[in-house]
Each structure stands twice: as C-alpha cells, then as structure tokens.
C-alpha cells in the first residue's frame, strides 16, 4: 500500500474519547492536506463503541488511518460494553472493526508513505507488556505475573 504526492504523516495517542472534553477536541482535528495520514497509536478509548466513533471520524478526515492498540483498548474490562470480549478475542474484534472502516492495523501489510523525500515504511508494531517493568515489591518475573493475576490484569 503506498501514498502518492505531498502531505504529512501525523501521529496521535491517548485520545481517551470516553471523556466528553476529549471528544470535543478530537472533533476539531482536521487534516491539513488531502494526502495526510494519521497514525493512531494507542488508548483511543475503553469502550468499543467509542473506538468505532473515533476511528470513523478520523477516516472521514484523513487519507489513511493506521491504528495500534494501547492498554485501554485491550485490557480495560468493559462492564456493559456491547462487545463484552477480552484478550485475543477482543483484539481480533477490534482488527475486524478497523478493516470494516478501512483502518490499517498491525495485522495488515505495512503501508509505504511516499511523500517528499525517500519512501518510508510505516510499521504499526503491537508489542506486548514486558514484565521486566515490575510492580513495587516484586523482584522476579514470576512474582510480577502472580501480582498481575491477583489484580485480574495479565498482559502476556
């Protein structure tokens, strides 16, 4: 997948559109050029309906939107959310949603940006949580995983 002509690749993260003020800010975001791409790199929202709202809005405004999940998309337990999914099933549901909207994901071939200068391959990497960043009071990976299990949030 390639782009043509001029334009800019923009990146944004931590939209948290479940908060009304953040929704208002996102509604004001516009591409500068018809060729602009937007990389949405995590924490769009907790609820699938909010993620869909945001990505739909952005695909109407940017030539190409590329999404990478953050912890809020994947690890937030959504009480009352229509999707009601966790883990891999939740991720696959979000990838399917992105495909319906024309949004690229880590599961798609890497797109190539061809603006001014040399071509640039955009690699939306989905990297798992690293337990070498351990909670206070844990000293080994096993202790960190046990702590995570006790809180109901295991990210591996």
Regions found by a protein language model. Give the residues of each.
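Beta-strand-turn-beta hairpins that frame and shape the catalytic cleft
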Residues: 2-10, 110-124, 145
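Short, flexible/disordered intra-domain loops and linkers
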Residues: 77-88
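Local beta-strand N-terminus motif with an aromatic residue
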Residues: 35, 102-103, 119
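Binuclear metal-ion centers of metallo-dependent hydrolases, dominated by the metallo-beta-lactamase
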Residues: 89-91, 95-113
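Active-site-proximal loop/helix segment associated with metal-binding centers of metalloenzymes
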Residues: 121-156
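N-terminal active-site segment of His-dependent metallophosphoesterases
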Residues: 1-67, 73-79
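Short catalytic/ligand-binding loop motif for oxyanion handling, primarily in non-cytosolic enzymes
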Residues: 75-77, 113-116, 122, 130-133
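Generic beta-sheet signal
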Residues: 68-70, 108, 125
């Amino acid at each position: 997948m390639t782009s043509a002509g001029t334009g800019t690749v923009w990146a944004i993260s931590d939209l948290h559109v479940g908060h009304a003020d953040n929704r208002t800010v996102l509604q004001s975001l516009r591409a500068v050029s018809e060729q602009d791409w937007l990389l949405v790199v995590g924490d769009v929202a907790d609820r699938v309906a909010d993620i869909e709202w945001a990505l739909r809005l952005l695909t109407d405004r940017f030539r190409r939107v590329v999404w990478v999940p953050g912890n809020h998309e994947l690890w937030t337990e959504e009480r009352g959310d229509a999707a009601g999914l966790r883990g891999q099933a939740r991720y696959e549901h979000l990838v399917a949603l992105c495909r319906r909207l024309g949004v690229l994901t880590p599961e798609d071939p890497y797109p190539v940006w061809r603006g001014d200068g040399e071509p640039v391959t955009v690699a939306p990497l989905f990297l798992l949580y690293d337990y070498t960043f351990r909670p206070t009071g844990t000293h080994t990976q096993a202790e960190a995983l046990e702590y995570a299990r006790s809180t109901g949030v295991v990210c591996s």
